[in-house]
Amino acid sequence: MSASGPANYEYVVARIRHRRAGLFGDDEYRKLLRMGTGEIARFMEDSTYKDAVDSLASRHRGMDLVEYALNEGLAAEFDALLSWSEGRLYDQLAKYLRKFDAWNVKTVFRGLYSHADTDAIRADLVDAGEFDAAFLDELLSADSVETVVDALSGTIFDTYLEPAFADYEDEDSLVPLENAVDRAYYENLNPSQPATAAQDSPEALYAEFLTAEIDFRNARNALRLARSGVSVDPAAYFIEGGTLFEASEMTTLVERQSDLVSRIQDSTYGDELSTALTALEESDSLIGFEHALDRALLSYSDHLSYVYPTSVCPVLAYVLAKEREVDNIRAIARGREAGMSEDEIQAELVML
């Protein structure tokens, strides 16, 4: 593990190929759909989550055990990725994994806003970013959204959250804060590439991957704003670094959803997002659209991995795939706990 020296893409990609083959597939998900939470935890013991389940089983049971084991297993997996990585790859991966800092900040915001208890919020935190356990505990101990914003002073989220907090107070909506967190994360990834970089250079491939993710995030955020009715300036929460939209046109696109959908359809992502747009039009469901967006991003990341097999692309694609696995297992366990039908739970899963 070192941020200096040459990148060891070939070595890390070879190890990831083995790990990716062990991800849950359709057969595993079908089995989980018929299990209770206790059975799901036992099923996880026979998988890569064994160490996490074993270490937590004396303190937790049922749904709590599943939740904590998933997050601990995810954090351990990404710690391993970092430990294998060298040079530019280490730097690229470490920055990318800050997404879990963003996730944790938004999770604490949501918990405080909904008056959830501390244990419920803690169960959703993933210790895989740069924030250490002590700082996460500090965020968890906050008694208000404003206290969390103050605690984040000096982090990459600092300057983004200050103006967003005023909008949050005016609108009583988390949308401004969540969009500000996304902007802080993505814009600090520095996805732009030097003009002289070759198309298959490490800089260019990293930029291409992140540009697609930013474009998909802007599409998601634009539609959320269009549906939320919150009277904030959409351009103020636009994420720089994509190619799908310009900040100057966001207000018009958010106000006229048909124009927004047409823009996505006519873009370079039109084919990848056709299923997502169809889901949006047929069911008028933003959740369905967001799930389809997630599937499209997984597919696009796999495409980049196929075209550039010895690069950062397969590494970041594996991060996305592992995240989706955890999200799917959690959705199944929560659905079973809530008494949802198999079809209802199936609709919550993101699979290719």
Swiss-Prot record:
Gene Ontology BP term (one): proton motive force-driven plasma membrane ATP synthesis
First-listed, main subcellular location of the protein, grouped into a coarse class: membrane
GO cellular component: plasma membrane; proton-transporting V-type ATPase, V0 domain
Pfam family, one: vATP-synt_AC39
Entry superkingdom: Archaea
Compartments reported by the entry: Cell membrane
Mode of membrane association: Peripheral membrane protein
Keywords: ATP synthesis, Cell membrane, Hydrogen ion transport, Ion transport, Membrane, Transport
Gene Ontology molecular-function annotations: ATP binding; proton-transporting ATP synthase activity, rotational mechanism; proton-transporting ATPase activity, rotational mechanism
InterPro entries: ATPase_csu/dsu_sf (IPR036079), ATPase_V0-cplx_csu (IPR014272), ATPase_V0-cplx_csu/dsu (IPR002843), V-ATPase_V0D/AC39_subunit (IPR050873), V-type_ATPase_csu/dsu (IPR035067), V-type_ATPase_csu/dsu_dom_3 (IPR044911)
Task of the protein: Component of the A-type ATP synthase that produces ATP from ADP in the presence of a proton gradient across the membrane.
Subunit and interaction comment: Has multiple subunits with at least A(3), B(3), C, D, E, F, H, I and proteolipid K(x).
Family: Belongs to the V-ATPase V0D/AC39 subunit family.
Protein name as annotated: A-type ATP synthase subunit C
Upper classification of the organism: Archaea, Methanobacteriati, Methanobacteriota, Stenosarchaea group, Halobacteria
Gene: atpC
